[in-house]
């Protein structure tokens, strides 16, 4: 269990820190030893999305990998951010 908690924190941190989406292989490559399998990483991503169920963001799979992004229901408010900074 402790390994899964640590794995979750590492993957979550990597997704938040990365400027680009991360592939399953890219996430696995973060680990020098005890590399998680692609299925383990997918399970962690599912767990993160359960954890984020009541938050404004989620982990999504896009063409180039996984990333954390704001859920689509917040577009109305978030679109104002770019207008204000222009």
Where are the predicted features?
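Short, Lys/Arg-enriched anionic-surface-contact patches
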Residues: 1-3, 86
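Charged low-complexity interaction tracts in eukaryotic proteins
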Residues: 3-6, 31, 46-76
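Positively charged, polyanion-binding regions of nucleic-acid-associated proteins
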Residues: 4-18
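Amphipathic alpha-helical interaction segments
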Residues: 9-13, 43, 61
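Short capping segments at the starts of secondary-structure elements
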Residues: 14-23, 36
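A short acidic, leucine-rich amphipathic alpha-helix
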Residues: 24-30
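Short amphipathic alpha-helical interaction segments
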Residues: 36-45
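Short, amphipathic alpha-helical interaction segments positioned at domain boundaries
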Residues: 74-86
